[in-house]
Amino acid sequence: MTEGLHLGELRRCFRGAVPAVIATATADGTPNITYLSSVHLVDNERIALSNQFFSKTSRNLAENPRASLLVIDPLTYDEYRLEVVFERTERRGALFESLRSELEAVACMSGMQEVFRLKAADVYRVVHIEPVLGAAARRGDPPPDVPPALDPATAADRMSELATRLARATDLDVVVETSVVGLAELLDYEHAFLALRDESGERLYVIASHGYDSQGVGSELSMDDGPVGLAARRCSPIRLGAMQQMARYGRVVRSSYEHRSSSGDEEIPLPGLDVRSLVAVPAMASGELVGVLVVESTHEVAFDETDEQILTVAATLIAAAIENERLREEVAVPAPETVSPEPGTRGGTPTSVRVFERDASVFVDGEYLIKGVAGRILRALLQAHEASGRVDFTNRELRLDPSLELPEYRANLESRLILLKRRLDEREVPFRIHKTGRGRFRLDVDADIRLELVSGSDG
């Protein structure tokens, strides 16, 4: 190996941003060149290559185990030629699973999941590294502006502070807000959102975000699509860099999340950003998926292994705090009976609220607000207020209300109430939800409401 140059110094080259190239040859010297979708750093002396359609390459290596790779730094475009010797093939185990996750992440960006299927992980020993002057250096461009990484000691101190803040949180709403704000204030992750698993176990919904023009609270993601869904489905972190080269992430993949079908279903847009790098980390508690913590950046290849480790710890802390608050809400003491004011007339044009019974989609003055469990909860609250002027409610009575069709999924109610509260605040509608105690909340109505229920046949 080249003296003074180690594989660890080439880490950016192995993040899948720029395709690498491998050259092999038959025993008689006939060459074959193939592009690589993924090169994985194994240790200081070895790399692993994804083998999904390497028939010619595999045949050549059986005859001649030596090969040459060209890898490129996605920021400086410096090139490095690696002379390697084939050592072994792995078809299971930790290395295989890690490489499969990387390959699936690349595939989901281009919609080629059925094509990019890992057959094996081929491990090579690197015997020589030859640096080649990059395009930026040849043009005389200044070095790229690479965001500095947190040093381990600082990261540990700030993670300790995040844990302290989460421990002091008084309810689930504070937990999710502390999570995304703490990532920005303590760990310098300016763009982040937290998505929780829904009751079906097949979708995620955004409950909190930070650093975006639009909060995107209530937007949904399928666990079958995209890097965030992949992180949830595999319960393992997904890290992507130079995403615009992969699939114009901000336009292509995000639009697939937000696609509106011909049935007329409404969706809330995800938090928007011109994304170039992403880390999606599963938030796990007691061996179960609670949600996914997502951090994004407008910088190319902004995140590395250290960021992934930091965010994995953060996601674990957040998941534990969420589950703890959910358990506390389940055993909360019911609120005492309260006397609600008689319904009055406020004057002016009433606010129109239409609820479509098919999926509980709610429209306020013609603008889409929310649907599903949160939509049914809002319908029940507005019906009670319309009938008797009630404004004070408890979580317990909602759990016992069969008309809400609440799912079996444990502690889903509190999450949906927070989702509804945040969505009402974001849209600035004339009725809001405010917590008045553990397991209690109030519906504040500042306008006359004209509630209309629309059956499936009418919609």
Annotate each predicted stretch with a short phrase.
Residues G29, A136-V174:
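Signal-transmission linkers at sensory-effector interfaces
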Residues A169-I207, Q215, E325:
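Helix-loop-beta substructure at the N-terminus of cytosolic sensory domains
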Residues E329-G375, R379, F431-H434, R438-R440, ...:
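Short boundary/linker motifs that mark transitions into or out of structured domains
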Residues E367-L400, L420:
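Short amphipathic alpha-helical recognition elements used for nucleic-acid or partner binding
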Residues I370-L378, L406-R427:
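DNA-recognition element of transcription regulators
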